[in-house]
Amino acid sequence: MSAEHPGTAWEHIGEKVSALSGNGPDYVDVFVQSGAGHSVTFEKGRIEEVSSAASGGVGARVLLEDHSVFSHSPDCSVSGAADCLEKVLSRARLSSSGKTFPCKVSISFDPTRLKVPDVSPFGQLDKAIRASSPFVRQVTLRHRVSGKRILVVRGDGNLVFDERFHSLFAVQVTVEKEGTIQTGYEVRAFQSEAGAFWDRVSPTQVGMQALERALLMLDAIPCPAGRMPVVLSGEAGGTMIHEACGHGLEADIVQKDFSVYRDRLGEKVASPLVTLVDDPSIEGAYGSYTYDDEGTPSRMNVLIDRGVLKAYMTDVQSARKGGIPLSGNGRRGSYRNLPIPRMSNTFLLPGKDNPASILEKAGRGLFVTKMGGGQVNPTSGDFVFQVTEAFLIENGRVGRPVRGATLIGNGPEALMKIEAVGDDLHFEPGMCGKDGQSVPVTDGQPSLLIRDLLVGGCDISDAES
């Protein structure tokens, strides 16, 4: 990340945007982006796919009282930004100052700054995984690196410049035993350049963990169905919190009356053990940034404080509409998209309970260590989540692995039923999709005990037979 100044040519556009925002429309801003990326897939003992791409452009927006006007262009030069701004002003039926903007500076990202991923260790890792078990049928290794520069000309005329790098390494292992096929998946992703990324990531460790997950599920029994205590480990990664709670706290969803948390600021919405935060300022986390895509500085936002709803995540439009503070959560998939409120690094703060004591407190039930996909209705809070790795809790201890489990419930009700929160906060990276836009995020949680939750699986008598 950098605080490098983009140059005086952009300041002319800043002066114009500032003058416009103070005379007519509610808000005017310009977003400029330039970036590049590389991706490598290693499969079947060889490099299967290599791709590289570079892209850039500009988006200009005018916020009026009840709607927004937006235009974008693939030209990220100063003159391209000026032309795009003129176009959106024309569409919004606003007059410009008639100034011209000299094209002296470009924020173009130099693709040569991104090193092509070194895949020389991948062959050795592939062989090591296959040699570790006769049941291995497929090994897939993926590595992605990307970098981009952004410039935001804010509504007050100020310029915000930022650089962002992301690196990801993922391993998927498929195993087969007596006709049963299972897959293990493990991923590491941070906001960092490739060199710093590999300083903190061991490819061998990631690969072997993926293999262990796959092999574990080969001997799993069908999951019993019914209501029972559920312990979500830190490794479950906060997926349920992200989906069943986080999206409902994004202000645009709240204002469209699609959220179960609408008009509930100051009310108790969770157990007093629950404090939920969103923090894009965490150094190196996959969902981090110094400024959001509207130029608002990042900061930690406490959304739920000891069970009480304190804040929503906002962008400029939703903050103005609701008369609520800017939280720094205005994000875009690219320059082609309007900013919308999005999560960044969203997690429950750790508690004081030892994870082993949480299992003892549960006594019996389901211990979830890896979550899959699911569906959530933000209006009601109802959810259904797949579980990719879980164990029975038997006499307060981890028991047999189970497969085919689903978690069925209601977000606010589940938050109210949290009876213990561990001291073992764990983060998992991912990509979050909303309104056709995808952005990097991190979800996190410590181990926690939900008093009772409906678990879908098979009939209990079938599992015991």
Residue spans of the language-model regions?
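N-terminal small-residue-enriched
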Residues: 1-465
